[in-house]
Amino acid sequence: MYKRKLTASDLLLIIVNLIPLYCVWFEGWSASEVFLVYCLETVIIGLVNVLKMASVTLFVRKTDTWENGGRSSMQSGWFFIFFFIIHYGFFVFIQTQIFFAVSRLIPNGSFLGSYAKIPALLGNNGKLMLIIFVAYYTVQTLFEFFTSGKYKTVSMGRLMFEPYIRIFVQQFVVILGSIFLNFGAGKIFILIFVVAKIFFELFINFNRFLEIAEKRERLKKEREQQI
């Protein structure tokens, strides 16, 4: 379950997350802006995952096995993508609404109005950090997904669920951090948050959880076939 060897991608992750920590503590960046960017990181990860799934569908295989309630069927890769967008999009909506309500960064308003205020709340520093995050995930995807050849073998089902475990952990901490913002302890909590995020990203092998789940599913199918 634990990673033992750090890669170049891991070192880049450390740098990317230490930049906002340094800027909040020593350059006067707003902790609220930084927390908002970490909240939006969920959206970035989702968009990157859609691009991965689309690449597999376009260049590797048009269909893949869809598991549902113990039954399996072949479905188009676009079906996987559509399902992911709806399911993950709903998840992002719930998470952002909770974040907005708890942090009180965005005054009560209309549904679309709340999201329309995000660019202004980010400010120049928040937008810069958002660009850094987009660049990081682009580079990470290029090397870990395409250059490594992973896109040729990964299943659409596996790819569809890869973001969830990591995002569950991150968003729980982000929402917890939004409570600290209300008490003016943003700088302290961002220190705790960044250290915790780096630890979980570097030393907890999230993909291992998916591998175990896939192995259990295969064993279950094998037992059913033997009966």
Describe each model-derived feature in a short phrase.
Residues Q75-S103, G123-Q140, I165-V169:
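Alpha-helical transmembrane segments of multi-pass integral membrane proteins
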Residues A8-V24, V34:
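The first (N-terminal) embedded transmembrane alpha-helix
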Residues P20-G28, L176-F183:
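Hydrophobic alpha-helical transmembrane segments
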Residues M1-L11, M156-I165:
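Short, amphipathic, aromatic/basic-enriched membrane-interface segments that mark the entry/exit
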Residues L121-V195, F206, L210-E214:
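Hydrophobic alpha-helical transmembrane segments and adjacent short intramembrane/lumenal linkers
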Residues V34-Q97:
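Hydrophobic/aromatic-rich structural module bridging two neighboring secondary-structure elements via a short loop
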Residues A101-G123:
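Membrane-interface interhelical connector segments
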Residues N207-I227:
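Short, highly charged, low-complexity non-transmembrane loops/tails of multi-pass membrane proteins
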